[in-house]
Amino acid sequence: MAPLVFNDLQALKELVGREIGASEWFSVTPERVDCFAEATGDRQWIHLDHERASKESPYGGTIAHGFLTLSLISHLMKDVMEIRGGVRLAVNYGLNRVRFPAAVRTDSRVRALVTLLALKELPDCAEAIYAVTVEIDKSDKPGCVAEWIVRYYP
């Protein structure tokens, strides 16, 4: 699925309050979880020890770090939309209301559903707030929900 392309921020502004779209499904592999553990130093057994997690964890196996799931949002967003004009730089400004309603099991697939909540002009940039739900394939609960704040500089 190709991303929705906006020629400028004004075109994006027309979608305030509406769902923009969904990303492609993305596999959360054990190798990715291992790399994230190495990069962050978070080596809890629930993420890395498949045998122990199968026996002792309430999830029946290893799970992705919540922060790994959260960090995938910027990657998944590339599948959803692209702004081609009037923006030289997009900066991750922060997050609101981050929650992890369900664990993302290793080897499961996730995708992002994105809604534009707000887009406002600031003195030196524009600020967008997106509601992002990271869905887990074959799960009733999402792996992550968050409001993502992005600043766009001309």
Per-region residue spans from a language model:
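HotDog/MaoC-like acyl-thioester-processing domains
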Residues: 1-15, 100-154
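Catalytic strand-loop segment that frames the active site of acyl-thioester-processing enzymes
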Residues: 2-64
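Generic structural detector for well-ordered beta-strands
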Residues: 21, 25-27, 99, 149-151
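Predominant activation on well-ordered alpha-helical scaffold segments within soluble catalytic domains
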Residues: 34-37, 70-74
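Hydrophobic beta-strand-centered segment that forms part of the acyl-chain substrate-binding groove
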Residues: 57-64, 71-113
